[in-house]
Amino acid sequence: MWFSYKYKQIPERNTRPGGDYYSGSLAIFASVKPRTYIAIDLKSFYASVECVDRGLDPLNTHLVVADASRTQKTICLAVTPSLKSYGIPGRARLFEVVQAVGRINTERRRSAPGRRFRGGSSDHAALLADPSLELQYIVATPRMAHYMEISGRIYGIYLRYFAPEDIHVYSIDEVFIDATAYLGTYKLSPHDLTRKIIQEVLRETGITATAGIAPNLYLCKIAMDLEAKHIPADKDGVRIAELDEQSYRRKYWTHRPLTDFWRVGHGIAARLEAAGLYTMGDIARCSVGQPWERYNEDVLYKIFGVNAELLIDHAWGWEPCTMADIKAYRPSANSLSIGQVLSAPYPYDKAKLIVREMTDQLVLDLVDKGLVTDQLTLSVGYDTSNAAEAPHEVLGGYRRTKTGPDSYQGPISTDWYGRPVPKPAHGSTNLPRPTSSTRLVTDAMMELFDRIVAPDLSVRRVYVVAAHVVREDSLDGVQLDLFEEPAEDASRERSRQEAILAIRRKFGKNAILKGMNFDEGATARERNEQIGGHKA
């Protein structure tokens, strides 16, 4: 579907499904006072930290952050810009980096004198100047606690300029800032103020950044993610891009792919393309189509329901959410969760051990935060080898996937790489009352595991959730179950839980463990030394 965007005037009112007239974003944005938002993204943050700590230039050094002690399938957490310039993506798997560098060096060898390398270097400038050098790169082991410390220092720099209520920490390396009230104070343009902050971060930490400036949060994110790629960097590698609604429509209504845009994943893009919508311009034009036309907003609402409104707003470059809205937001429901991707396919019994370990930790997290839950959810993803007709290795030995009438005949889905894989198992169970009892929660989770997980399939991903969590001290009026555990037993269990937490806080998470943590395939001890699934 292709439109020529020589637009008729946007209607003042548009009819939404349900019959009511909708002034929606049109009225909202007409009444909103213009604001100035800044988005700042620290450039290849983890990799830059590792370069700075080694006394190397992050913009001129080939380095990846990855745990090489795992298999080469491990994901690289960061890749330096100089290595990305060879076409290596920022979240490649380590084996993809190895393969890409191998291809690069094959080409370089052809240009080398005598087609032989006389040495190697991870310095980008040296490699450009001397074709006889082999391209090398540094593999840095992740240090998540250190990255968090550096991120905290950089946040402290932001606080020199802005109040906490005007800063939204989006991730460890990215923030949104409402700078509207500060431009007059500092007597600087948005661009100059942004540059001043980034230069201060660079001076104190050695880390540079990319930034986007726009009148709303969505556009400043797009300016940072997309527009900044098309402008030249300064001598420090800094790119600061600006967008408004008109320039966004002019530059990005024909941009493809849709997945480049914030909040548009592969699933959403696929559903849009199935409807004949390939660009943000297509979506915007569809949203103002007349009811009798093939493309109108009903098409979007039938596909996405209420979420179509967000998609339409973003297609036009609108975003009604403000920094104040973010700070005031309180979720209507809360949950606590733990997930992990296993290093190898796990058979049923070993996968059950993993779920037991994770449930044990989930309960301790509840106790530590003073929370209780009355609903548990378990999601289990199977390994791709279950859909293969060949022997495959699982923890503890080999398993031959059966062929013929006894082979796996259940529903099949596809993974990120398009490989067939059995449909994941997913289920929930309700507890008789809100609780943080290890015994009650673990028993319920084990029963759920037995109910939903196929015993003849190997497992690769596990996700456990405590849903409907509330503060324990808010339950004074809750009716208790007549068959609940005696108060004395509950008191002893709580004392044990609190003792375990106290020991771990003082001496580390591995200071006190359970017997199951030493069984073959257990992962708790290793995970206790990680942050976010990576080495602390």
Segments the model singles out, each with a brief description of its role:
Residues 2-5, 9, 13-323, 479, ...:
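Gly/Gly-Pro- and Ser/Thr-rich, intrinsically disordered tail segments characteristic of DNA damage-repair
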Residues 39, 260, 270-458:
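DNA-contacting surface of Y-family translesion DNA polymerases
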Residues 70, 184, 218, 341, ...:
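Generic "edge-of-domain/loop-turn" microfeature
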Residues 213-219, 313-314, 372-384, 458-470, ...:
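A glycine-rich phosphate-binding loop feature that marks nucleotide/adenosyl-phosphate handling sites
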Residues 447-502:
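C-terminal hydrophobic structural anchor segments
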